[in-house]
Amino acid sequence: MAAVAAAIPIEPIYNMEKLSYEIFSILESKFLFGCDDSPRLSPSAKNLPISVAGGGGRVRILSIDAGGSTDGLLAGMSLRHLEMALQKRSGDPDARIADFFDVAAGSGAGGVLAALLFTSGPDGRPIFTADEALRFLAENRGSRRKGIFGKLFRTRGDKRGRIFRRIFGDSTLKDALKPLLIPCYDLSTGAPFVFSRADAMETDGFDFRVREVCEATAAEGGRRKGTAVVARSVDGRTEVLAADGGGVAVGNPTAAAITHVLNNGHEFPLANAVDDLLVASIGNGECDGWRRAEDFVRIAGDGVSDMVDQAVSMAFGQNRTSNYVRIQGNNACGSPHSIKNSSSIDTEKLMRAAEEMLTQKNVESVLFRGKKVAEKTNTEKLEWLAGELVEERERRMACAGLPVVVLKQASPRSSSSTC
């Protein structure tokens, strides 16, 4: 009989209190109680010459919010624009999002996007381009059922995962091109559970099929075991009962991604503080009106996402404009396509609303001052980000020092009897 996740010795569950503690610990040490500028090297980098250990590049993190008011379409459109900009700036028409990021985290619709863009196909390249991923979201959004992926969840049992099975086949987390973090809410433990490539590399007990990971993070059946999505590890030893999806568990996974990098010295030996990171956090629009229970859930999710944005922006401090980019739509700007209830809006109109959000002025979080409207639009911020990502890749190609990222390699598949 399969054991629930809580029975496994290694625990990849990210408790929200722990996440808050981690990110605000950074705030305390860096801004609130004095600043220690001395570098803190991870164990794998302590014995290196200072010129090598301190001369590396930045770890590039991509974080994608849950559905938001655009059901994932704003993030999909942002990533399509970013991928096109990367192709243009790098001169490589085959460049993909996964080529320019070291870590990807996504929740809900954002988790599905991350899986589409970072899962390896038979040719060793991502199975979807950003444009194909956007079209996948648009085609499978569903217009008559509340929430994201209505078409995917009209039937129960095995039929529910038919589309994900067709897309991902038997690919598992080990097939992710880069470290991947995708959360859901686990009924077995009553806490968020994060599917992680790093944990999958350690043991088959944490290696899940990507199709089940996507079902889990996009689940919207409510917290009843009869409607929960079941995800089992490839060895059958770990079972996750996912309900409410990743959007309720961790709507904005940026803090989880940062915590993962700063506490993973094996794969990121030179990442000692937020100054060593380049973070792109992609939102999915905020609700500006609500009437039903699910709308209150959405607005609560928006509030949590904003809180994470504020915390991360504060952690970066003066470097927030060069190391941290947040792309988010603001429905309070008097848009003619203002979104009151995305489930009642057809996909074409929602796509137009997402396009308009990209033309809005970017909104930045400022230390102790809330938010301010930036001079650049969201589109211009994406263009700037593309330039930073291309420069970072070129810098790494020209540097012969210690790699910024040393990914764990997949070990031979162990049997279910292996401890």
Which residues does each predicted region cover?
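Conserved catalytic cores and adjacent C-terminal regulatory segments
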Residues: 2-419
